[in-house]
A protein has these predicted regions:
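Structural motif
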Residues: 121-124, 144-145
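Conserved G/P- and acidic residue-centered "switch" motifs that form tight phosphate/ATP-binding loops
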Residues: 73, 105, 135, 161
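GNAT-family acyltransferases
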Residues: 1-100, 163-164, 168-185
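Conserved acetyl-CoA-binding loop-helix of GNAT-fold acetyltransferases
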Residues: 103-117, 136-144
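Conserved hydrophobic/aromatic "anchor" residues
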Residues: 15, 65, 117-119, 147
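Conserved catalytic-core motifs of GNAT/GCN5-like acyltransferases
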Residues: 128-131, 148-165
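Short amphipathic helical patch at the helix-1/turn junction of helix-turn-helix
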Residues: 97, 132-133
Length: 185
């Protein structure tokens, strides 16, 4: 039986202490639409963060996973659930793929694996994604996955010297099931 954390292109796994070097490259990618300029960090701070993530005890519904390729075992990004409303049955997630690894289907597959777990195993009813309006790649990705724009917070985020709209997108479990099937293939 195949792992529910493994697809054709990617495998989702725990973050390991040795992953710190890859995260320094992802953080240096200021070219991502929507990435906020960050203060420079030391290599030691990335080592400490990766070590902390490796031993973190998630609450079951909020967690971050490494995304690595199945072909080469190369770390290409992260995906995770970071906010939940367990009473109402919703969760919010994020996905980050390093610049050298974009447009290869890694984000698509990582998100499908995450959503399948959250809908099937954790019994959530709705998934939320929040995207800066000028991040066309993420808007297109979520649209292809079946998310629907549910709202827009106008000029809600200040970034790079001006205010930007924030797009709220959602997908219900039954919508996901029709497109991707909740039970793994």
């Amino acid at each position: 039986m195949a792992s529910s954390w493994t697809g054709e292109r990617v495998r989702l796994r725990a973050i390991e202490p040795d992953d710190w070097a890859a995260f320094t490259h992802f953080a240096d990618d200021d070219g991502r639409p929507g990435s906020r300029p960050a203060l420079p960090r030391s290599a030691e701070s990335y080592r400490a963060w990766a070590k902390e993530q490796a031993v973190a005890k998630g609450d079951g519904d909020r967690f971050r996973l490494a995304v690595e390729t199945t072909a080469r075992g190369e770390l290409v990004g992260t995906v995770g659930s970071h906010r939940t409303g367990s009473r109402s049955g919703w969760f919010e997630f994020d996905v980050t793929i390093g610049a050298d690894h974009r447009r290869k289907g890694y984000a698509t597959e990582a998100v499908v694996l995450l959503l399948r777990f959250m809908f099937a195993e954790r019994r959530y009813h709705k998934c939320l994604a929040v995207v800066l309006a000028h991040n066309e790649a993420s808007l297109a990705l979520f649209g292809r996955l079946g998310f629907t724009e549910e709202g827009r917070l106008r000029e809600h985020v200040f970034l790079a010297g001006r205010h930007h709209d924030l797009v709220m997108m959602g997908m219900l479990a039954d919508e996901f099931d029709r497109r991707h099937t909740i039970s793994a293939p």
